[in-house]
Amino acid sequence: MGKHIIPQRRGHGSLVYRSPSHRHVVDVKHLKPGEYVVKDIIHAPGRNSPLLELVDSTGKKVYQIAFTGAYVGQKIVAGNVDTINPGTTTVLANIPDGSYVYNIESSPGDGGEFCRSAGTFALVVSHGSRVTLKLPSGSMRDFDPRCRATVGVVAASGIIDAPILKAGTHVHYLRSKAKRPYTVRGVAMNAVNHPHGGGNHQHVGRPSTVGRNAPPGRKVGRLSPKRRKVNGSK
């Protein structure tokens, strides 16, 4: 009897494949309208960008994704404001063209979905019935003017330039994101572990195309590929 393949194990949801959410600081959403002071800049497990630990007028702690240039003691404003500074959170209708923004809402009130990882930002291109932003991928996307965003660029833009140096460091980094630190090819496995495994040399040994409705244990290889057209055929 064969063993479950990796997608089946991941779908089962054991601790190996589950994100260690008990280590995460908080699920970062947009700030409520008001004034805040940066108390500290902290590391957040599972994220590649730091977080700002903020304090409001009542002394309550809240968190925000850090932006480039933030410092302890800095004052940050959220809501409808006249002056736009880095770290200000407001609706897109109030942010002028040419500004860099991050943590952009997809729909008003969802807390932010776009441009949240280290070094990312979007460019405000134009205003109208919809606000047009240029995303990091280069694509243009229209947003509701009531969607909120934070002015600035997400901090830690140089994270991809810093070498990891040690394999163990990379393992812990990926496990905090519930990702596997390595990948083993199916043809390199034994026949009991994968449909492509086994044999005297590494080869699939069968057609690698599988149907869209194949069961999970057999759904590996080229999934429901389109039919290849031959020259001269209709």
From Swiss-Prot:
GO cellular component, as recorded: cytosolic large ribosomal subunit
Transmembrane segments: none
Source organism: Thermoplasma volcanium (strain ATCC 51530 / DSM 4299 / JCM 9571 / NBRC 15438 / GSS1)
Molecular functions per Gene Ontology: rRNA binding; structural constituent of ribosome
Similarity remark: Belongs to the universal ribosomal protein uL2 family.
SUPFAM superfamilies according to UniProt: Nucleic acid-binding proteins, Translation proteins SH3-like domain
Gene: rpl2
Pfam families per record: Ribosomal_L2_C (PF03947)
GO biological process terms on file: cytoplasmic translation
Keyword Ribonucleoprotein: yes
InterPro entries referenced in this protein's UniProt entry, alphabetically: NA-bd_OB-fold (IPR012340), Rib_uL2_dom2 (IPR014722), Ribosomal_uL2 (IPR002171), Ribosomal_uL2_arc_euk (IPR023672), Ribosomal_uL2_C (IPR022669), Ribosomal_uL2_dom3 (IPR014726), Translation_prot_SH3-like_sf (IPR008991)
Keyword Ion transport attributed: no
Region listing for Disordered, in residue ranges: 195-234
Quaternary structure, from the entry: Part of the 50S ribosomal subunit. Forms a bridge to the 30S subunit in the 70S ribosome.
Protein name per UniProt: Large ribosomal subunit protein uL2
Function: One of the primary rRNA binding proteins. Required for association of the 30S and 50S subunits to form the 70S ribosome, for tRNA binding and peptide bond formation. It has been suggested to have peptidyltransferase activity; this is somewhat controversial. Makes several contacts with the 16S rRNA in the 70S ribosome.
Residue stretches of biased makeup (Basic residues): 219-234
Keywords for this protein: Ribonucleoprotein, Ribosomal protein, RNA-binding, rRNA-binding
